[in-house]
Amino acid sequence: MIDLKKYTKANLKPSVSELLPIFSLANPDVIRLKDEGLCALYKVRGIDSETFGSDFISYYADRLEDALKGLGENWTVSFFLIRKRNYYYPDIEFKSSVSKYIDEKYKERVLRNKNYVNNIYISFIYRENRSKLKIFKKVFERDGKKITEKVKSLSEKKTKEDVIKELKERLRLINKELEGIAESLPKLGLERLKDEELLAAYYFVVNPAQDLRQGGIRLPDYAFLDEYLTDFTVDADYEEAIKLDSSVYKVLSVKDYPQETYPGVLDGLLSLDKELKFSCSFSFLSKEKAKSLMKKRRRHYFVTRKSLLHQASETATGEETKLIDPTKMSYVYDTEEAMQELDLVRPFGIASVNFIAWGKAEKEAEETSAKITGVLKDRGYQVLTESLNKISAYFSAVPGGDKLNPRSFMVSLGNFVDYIPFRTILIGDKFNFYLKAPALCALETKHKTLFYFNFHVKDVGHTVIFGPTGAGKSVILNFLAAQYMKYDPQVYFFDFGYTAEILSLAQNGLHVDFKPEKRTYLNPVSLISKKGGKSFLRDFLQVLIESFGYSMDDEDLKQLWKAIELVASLPKNKHVLESFSSILPQNLSDKLRPWVTGEYKNYFNNPVDMLNLSKYTVFEMKNLSGANNSKVIPPLLMYLFERIDSSLSSLIPTIIILDESWFELQHPIFAGKMQEWLQTLRKLNTIVVFATQDLMHVAENQRMLSSVLTNVSTKIFLPNYKADTTDMKNLYINTFGLTENEFEMVITGTPARDYLIKQEHVTRMAQLSLDENITALIQSDEYARRLAKAIKLRGGDDWFKDYVEHFKKRTPLKEVEDLSEYFVN
């Protein structure tokens, strides 16, 4: 038995090994304890608090209770939540200098703020009745030898086979039990730890001020883990704290609990602006043992409901006093109610709850403990800081240390489940497993927990963004496009209002501004000699001919194909739209005339095609949005899509972005192409990201809606207070699958800051706050665009940095443009 009192003396610095309950590895995924117990440790993903509302959390708490209730009296289950500062940022070397600049500025802002991550672990401990375990001492006796050597030394003895057989059977039964629990709770994301990861996690739970050791802790050459894992001592020379390694720890215990609990009662700790550890343990009692303890408890409270003075008075006078302690009587009633629960086969056990704060100095630990105390008091708990029992309380909060806790209490499993920290704030994936690179970006949240965002969920990266004008669609599209350059991709951006022009200039990309009065220098007929070019040209010319209401019949299509074959045989300088005027039958030639010599001649009747797609290509579409240009959009999109399709390769990541896609969605050709893209482009390492201000444009097109719901892995909803109507609520919830909680976040979020991201396993209200160094590059007003073009004329790889400084100072255009003309001349 460990004498914990001696560690309260000043300046004692004993080895931690004597305090740890662990002894050796019984299996790669099982730790043997000093009291002969066996311990398995799991890392827990947890259930996201924003993804699931209170109804689901209550339901899952019942599921968790059902999964655990079959464990029985030999089991102890413990949960550990460790909230740690998170300094990880998804760094990568950008080839694009402007994307690197944006990332550096954004990283400075993100890391300037404190961010945290919640780590959750569960330990399961199985302890046999001690009378059955005496035989193990023959094998596990501490004499400095490896267990394998010890077993080998008993090779001629009968007990060796008995010991190994007994151990294997215990391990088999334990694993079977734990596998059943893990399978019944898939949303918890239980990951059984073993070998190096098991040791690293155990060390982390013991000394949480230290960071979790990535890559694990190497397995020892000898068996005794208590000595192997402790490279520091305990310093008890504090009244209400202990020092491990270089950190000072304070332990908080609960001395009184609220009358009512509910699942997630302690979720306030998940967003606390401090590092902390929260642990709770539950040791199952047999029904007989629980009933015996309850009877003793009831008898104690019933007897003490009257003070000694009143009891003496009753004895002396023979009259019963009516002065009864109401608190004690309430405890009597609570105990009677608990006994009724026990009769209903609801498990009871001995529970303990601890909270641990730390810092480099005692004052820092005290600040954290005060914050924890505030959260607990708000929920009706009374807490105290451990002093005399600080060491036993601290080491009771490690797997296997539950028996050391000085403040345990009996409680039903159902009530204990309310304390369990199975709810958390998921951080997303730090790594994009599909692209084999760091995550796209780290977004901040109100929980002070970064969310690592990726378009991809598994191998699907298609994304839709819904939000009204002014809610921040263009900002997030341009920011994510700049961040996507970390993967060295091709970017095709269909812009609507010049928001992407400055960034495309800074990327040394191509910006194509389609205007009715300007010649486009597009020549779709130049594709006639390419693979699949004739088939494309047949469909393209059919759209041109039918654009004024004519419907081509089979004979027309035959004549069109003949004309295509004939033009294909002509010299390349004759591969122009005008060549079809003299080859097609007169009726078809007349229908084609507006595109050759008439109103729309600037678009496709050009001697050469000068559209040389770049790594970063922007198509500005706003000037084609008028009714007079409605006939231009279908054939123009057809040609641009054909050029984009021909550039795609599974070897090069590609992102196609469509801002204000309602403009394109109103045309059947685009809607059909979008459905095709969503179904097929993932095989070509390509994702489509489209934004629209109106959900109805998607919802009213049943084929498009079905494709979005089936093939789009990421949906981003921007704040929209105008959506707080019955019809809009129905659209968000019943059509696009938001929960009541998620819809509430949409109508109450802050425009141009909050973005509700909904993916397969997580919903997160992320925040994107960009400083002026970045927003300067996403401006669409004439001043900013002229300023950027003028400064770019001066030359230099990093001209955009000068532009940002001039933009922030609002330098007059005349000063910059006059100087730029000097550089050009």
List PLM regions with ranges.
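Extended, folded cores of ATP/NTP-driven motor/assembly subunits in large transport
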Residues: M1-I427
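The conserved Walker
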Residues: V457, T469
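Hydrophobic anchor at the beta1->P-loop junction of P-loop NTPases
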Residues: I465
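Conserved lysine of the Walker
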Residues: K473
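Hydrophobic positions on the alpha1 helix immediately C-terminal to the Walker A/P-loop
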Residues: I476
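Post-Walker A helix-loop "phosphate-sensing" segment adjacent to the P-loop in P-loop NTPases
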Residues: A482-Y492, Q507
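A short helix-turn-beta junction within AAA+ P-loop NTPase domains corresponding to the substrate/partner-engaging
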Residues: G509-V512, R703-F717
